[in-house]
Amino acid sequence: MKDKMSVFAETVLRQKYAQDGETWADVAHRVVKTVYKSVSAPKSLVEQTTQYVIERKFIPGGRYLYATGRPYHQVNNCLLMRAEDSREGWADHLQKCSMGLMTGAGIGTDYSSIRSEGKLIRKTGGFATGPCALMQILNEAGRFIMQGGSRRSALWAGLKWSHSDIQKFIHMKDWIPEVRALKARDFNFPATMDGTNISVQLDDDFFTAFNKEDSLAEQVYWSTVERGLKTGEPWFTVDCGKNKHETLRNACTELTSADDSDICNIGSIHLARITDLEEMKSVLGCAIPFLLAGTVYSDVPYAKVDTIRTKNRRLGLGLMGIHEWLLVHGKKYGVDADLDKYLEIYATSTDVAKQFAKEWDLSAPVKTRAIAPTGTIGIIGETTTGIEPIFCAAYKRRYLKGHIWNYQYVLDPTAKRLIEREGVNPEDIEDAYVLAEDVERRLAFQAHVQKYVDHSISSTINLPQWGSELNNKDTVQKFGKTLMKYLPHLRGVTAYPDGARDGQPLTPVSWKTAVKHVGEVFVESMDICELKGGSSCGS
């Protein structure tokens, strides 16, 4: 496969990750050589890993590409936090989150332990303001703290389904028409929780209650589904069985933990560039030790993070290019026996990690696999992101250059290859909008892949706009029943109706329009903020 990058991939590389005019090969050498020095890796491993990165068969997470070699090198991504229910706990949480954001981490917080709004505070005689208040304080901090001084802060908030304030939480983003209009004109206009992704947390008790037709469980479920179908949030995270204590998540929700101040550490294998099963084993055998070395190399924002990282040493090796792999092999998006052979090798990462941890005298990682949404590294890899289908054959993508928002017309690289090499009609490519008519296929596939993943999968189901034929008040029950069929087998689910938020980063356009303008860069008429349509973790 040719290694020459497209103009758009080169633009993203140059503006987000390259240091001092580096080429992609330069970035690969800088990142791999520097990270492996922390564990005295053998020369053969360094050279082979570097070659796989150059060939884009394995791409480390965005923090590795950006921060490796800098004086402060926090290459592990998001912090996974738990907010404690006390004045000291609130202050400590805000301080740690600020430290994390300023050094490059996204923040995911479980707020379920905070007492509900209106509860009596015995020491002062006052009343609690509840978890939603603390979420909003952190949301406003994130508005003014550029993550690592270079990008918009990434935040996630979760609240348990049985919390007394759950309905307030579910409706936090029900912005009044006046606010929506102002944000349509200027997306920097502040609105409640506009910089935070939110999820309702489900557990074994929820599913037991729902199956017994418990009124609270049903009310929470259906109100969440309807809000999600209308506005894109909130949706669900799922923590059941052996994972029941892992309620903490990173900002994109694919990493999970039970321990406050845990940290995620991600990179992805580009499945569509892997030639066969033997090469899959070889790439895996380089990706895992690289991420393991990253747990030694990376700086952290405060001491507890290092303590928890040493205890858990979580790795988040993901996959991307799954839909491209299926397309190249003439297969439809969905469960496939040949794909499973690659997933089975992927699942051996636990044993590979234990082997290298023993060789390097490190604690063995408690878990090793998490499929991130691979936003910008998916662009660099020029493939389909995570487990996502092709978004669409051609689209307009907005991105930040300094403090100014630009956009370019993009020909999806997978679609482009199929159209140019195989003569496929652009209108015949099965994309996210086609699959919006078959939500069950999307959910069934995610549930199947989850069997091979010990953390979680961050994936967004694209849906038609609320009020359209396939997404309206009459389709809520059908969607909700289909979702419930698969929800116990997932670790989380997200869906996004087209146009739910003004200023969304990806907008479908015609193939003809994109071809006409490809390679051109346009400047937005106003400075507006990017929503999550790829990895807010820079993965």
Which residues fall in each region the model found?
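A glycine-rich phosphate-binding loop feature that marks nucleotide/adenosyl-phosphate handling sites
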Residues: 52, 66, 111-117, 157-166, ...
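Catalytic alpha/beta core of large soluble enzyme barrels
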Residues: 4, 248-260, 267, 291-296, ...
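Conserved, charged catalytic cores of large soluble enzymes
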Residues: 1-47, 123-137, 147-245, 319-354
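A structural-propensity feature for long, helix-poor, extended segments
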Residues: 116-155, 274-299, 403-446, 454
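Extended active-site and interfacial segments that coordinate phosphate-rich ligands
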Residues: 91-99, 115, 127-139, 173-189, ...
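Acidic/polar, glycine-rich intrinsically disordered N-terminal extensions of enzymes
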Residues: 1-75, 81, 481, 488, ...
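Internal maturation/activation junctions in enzymes
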Residues: 286-306, 310, 321, 326-374, ...
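Function-dense linear segments that define catalytic or interfacial modules
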Residues: 14, 19, 34-41, 50-123, ...
